[in-house]
Amino acid sequence: MNIALKDMFLRLWKKYFDGAELPIAFYYTNEEKVAENDPATSGRCLIENLIKVRMGTPLRFGKNSIGCPGGRRYAGFSATLSENFEYFLSCGIPGVVEGERYKKSPELVREVMKKFPEFEAPNNFIVFKRWDQLDESDEPKVVIFFAKPDVLAGLFTLANFDEIEEGVLAPFGSGCSSIILHPYLEGENNPPHCVLGMFDISARPYVHSEIQTFAVPIAKFDRMVENMQESFLITSTWEKIRNRIIPS
C-alpha cells in the first residue's frame, strides 16, 4: 500500500478527529500470514469478531472460519442462501424457522434477492486490520469507520466535498454486506460511493448504541484524505464539533 497515504491519514485524523476510533480496512489474499479466526471459540457474527480487529488484533477469514452463512455470502465465499431464507427474513415458519420480520413477506424477499448483487471473493481469504497496522505489502480495498454521530457527520460531509451527485449510499442489507460487499463493489464504479451502514438490527448488539459504519472504497478514501486540509475541517465551524469528540 501507499505508506505515505497511511501516515498522512494518521496525522490528519489526529488533527481533525482526535480521540475518535481509528478505522479498519480489509483486503483479499491467498497468504496465511495473519492468524485465522476460529469459529469454535469466537462469536458467530462477523461484526462481533471484528471487535478484536478494532482493538488491534488483525484477523483472517475464509469460507470455513466465518460462523454465519450470511457472513460467508457477503464476504464472497458462498453463493447459496440458507434454507427458507425468504421466511427467515420475513414472517418465519412456525416450528421451523423464526422470522426476523425485516421484510413484509417471503415473496418480497425473493424479489429483493433477485436484484441483490452477486459477488465472488477474488482470493481464498479476507484479512481485516486496523489502519495503523497495515504494512507496505497490504493492498486495502475498503476502509471502514465505526463512528459516532459527530464523526459520521464529518465523514459524510467530506465524502460529498468534491462530488456533484450524492457521494454516500445506504443500501438495505446485513451489517456485513454494508461493510464488505457493497463498498467493495462500489470500488469498481466511477465514481465510487461511500456506504453508510450498520442498520441491521441483528448486528447492532455488537456495536455501541451510537455507532454506525461508514465504509469507503480505497480510491474514494485517497481523495477524501487529499481533500481534508482544504475542506470544512479547517474552519471554526468544525472546531466546535472537533472539541467535543469524546475519545473512543
Set out the residue ranges of the language-model regions:
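Ferredoxin-type iron-sulfur electron-transfer modules and their immediate structural context
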Residues: M1-N2
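Acidic, serine/proline-rich low-complexity intrinsically disordered regions
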Residues: L5-S248
